[in-house]
Amino acid sequence: PASADTLGATVIAPVVEESAKAAAVLLIFLFRRREFSGVVDGVVVAGFTATGFAFTENILYLGNAFGEDQLSGSSGFASVTAGTFFVRIVMSPFAHPLFTVLTGLGFGFAAVSARSHRARRIALPLLGLLLAMGLHALWNGSSSFGPYGFYAVYGIVMVPAFGLVTWLAIWSRQRELRALAAELPVYAAAGWLTPAEPSALSSMRARGMARDLARHWQPDR
């Protein structure tokens, strides 16, 4: 029945799928704690986790759509495969990463919270997970809001949310680099770093150049 399909898409799927993806983020947060130190780490870990999930799910959906087209004899732009490809690959390739990044942000903010704020460190990931489930449910249920519900949710909610998360990740990265630029010269003055290292480590461009140089450099023989 249509009501059962709607319930599955808007309640069961968001809860199960976001919980599964959050479990992967939680494992890294717990067992690779030194590498999970802030908001950017939360965005990256959650984004990669959800991208792998979306890749697998898209293959399943496209495979099922292709099977339907084989049975019905449909082909071209009117086929189920073409429609599925347009909605999942063209219109919403970042849907799953966007949902789970909200969970990752919760873990990221928890990572920078003081250890004495135990309640906050628990509540923030849970809040992120609830937001991820809510956005996922809204997205899955958008088609039930009328003929233009999908496009309304896409333009009013999904696009601004994606832009906000992108801005937050860039801002957080720049903040970390400014902190390095301010603090590392003290270590250089103490002799723990060379004079050039603080500038190199506080610039993404300089880091990239250093990696390229190390990749192509060969010692004299």
Regions found by a protein language model. Give the residues of each.
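Hydrophobic alpha-helical segments at protein termini of multi-pass membrane proteins
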Residues: 1-221
